[in-house]
């Protein structure tokens, strides 16, 4: 007799419906016991999602308090003060991913909230060097190529410019 025939039905194929318990949050709220808690947790999908969100927010608040010394309420005050956007690019609004807390690495002072691109690649790459940004402003206002060869439109951009 093959070994597979001797075994009992696999764990996954057993009917576990009888083992499911009602959601503990539904029971606590007095809701009808129609929603089962999915294995392995004690909550239905709706309450499990709420629990995960609450746990995520709590751990985030604990982390920013330990790392930057600001509370979740102070974070949201800064967020509102900045108009709900990254202070530098004004594009990112922190809805999909929370804005990063930016701080001065030399003094430790919290400066504001920035998107990942501005915090990591703009300020991080420049290493908080003010001269870097002065050169960048000068570069945008007075490009060196224009000084040397005059205004010349790149062929890749010529088609776009002629259509407008």
Swiss-Prot record:
InterPro entries, sorted: Endonuclease_7, Endonuclease_7_sf, His-Me_finger_sf
Superkingdom of the organism of origin: Viruses
Pfam assignment, any one: Endonuclease_7
Name of this chain's protein: Gene 59 protein
Source organism of the structure: Mycobacterium phage L5
């Amino acid at each position: 007799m093959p070994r597979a025939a001797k075994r009992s039905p696999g764990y996954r194929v057993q009917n576990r419906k009888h083992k499911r318990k009602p959601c503990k949050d539904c029971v606590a709220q007095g809701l009808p016991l129609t929603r089962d808690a999915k294995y392995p947790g004690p909550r239905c999908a709706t309450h499990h999602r709420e629990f995960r969100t609450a746990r995520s927010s709590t751990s985030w608040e604990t982390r920013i308090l330990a790392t930057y010394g600001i509370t979740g309420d102070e974070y949201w005050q800064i967020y509102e003060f900045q108009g709900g956007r990254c202070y530098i690019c004004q594009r990112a609004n922190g809805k999909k991913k929370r804005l990063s807390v930016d701080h001065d690495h030399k003094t430790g002072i919290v400066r504001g909230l920035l998107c990942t691109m501005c915090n990591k690649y703009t300020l991080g790459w420049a290493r908080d060097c003010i001269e870097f940004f002065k050169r960048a402003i000068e570069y945008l206002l007075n490009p060196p190529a224009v000084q040397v060869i005059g205004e010349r439109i790149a062929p890749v951009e010529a088609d776009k410019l002629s259509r407008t």
